[in-house]
């Protein structure tokens, strides 16, 4: 059964899942033409292979421990850690421990290409 997307103005519980984390699945919280928010669940030992996303992204670790693999670095993410990536930057995500993260993807006017950053 698909989870419903949050409506504008609706509070969403993003607290750590604790013992429920091992049975949890990744799900989209909301998607609009300008952004998408996803609760990303990455079990220990599982790696999301290197890929690119057209929009800028942020990842905030809610619980657990994950590693973000970049072309020139590996970043450890633990509860409370936050990272920003430019659009189209190759990256992978690996669960070191069961982890859940808040993924936000920012889209431009066409729903894909990120807005240019001001100078």
Predicted regions and their residues:
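A short, N-terminal "cap"/entry segment at the start of jelly-roll beta-barrel domains
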Residues: 1-36, 117-119
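Conserved short histidine dyad/triad with adjacent acidic residue
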Residues: 23, 36-53
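Short, conserved beta-strand element in jelly-roll/cupin
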Residues: 41, 52-67
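Histidine-centered metal-chelating micro-motifs
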Residues: 47-49, 83, 87-92
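A cytosolic small-molecule/anion-sensing beta-strand core signal
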Residues: 62-63, 78-79, 97
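Short acidic-glycine-tyrosine-enriched beta hairpin
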Residues: 72-88
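Ligand-binding loop in jelly-roll beta-barrel domains
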Residues: 87-110
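Short, charged, intrinsically disordered terminal tails
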Residues: 109-119
């Amino acid at each position: 059964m698909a989870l419903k997307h949050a409506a504008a103005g609706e509070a969403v519980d993003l607290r750590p899942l604790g013992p429920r984390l091992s049975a949890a699945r990744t799900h989209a919280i909301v998607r609009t033409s300008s952004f998408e928010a996803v609760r990303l669940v990455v079990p220990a030992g599982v790696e999301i292979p290197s890929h690119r996303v057209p929009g800028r992204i942020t990842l905030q670790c809610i619980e657990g421990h994950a590693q973000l693999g970049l072309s020139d670095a590996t970043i450890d993410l633990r509860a409370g850690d936050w990272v920003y990536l430019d659009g189209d930057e190759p990256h992978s995500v690996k669960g070191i421990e069961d982890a859940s993260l808040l993924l936000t993807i920012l889209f431009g006017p066409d729903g894909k290409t990120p807005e240019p950053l001001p100078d």
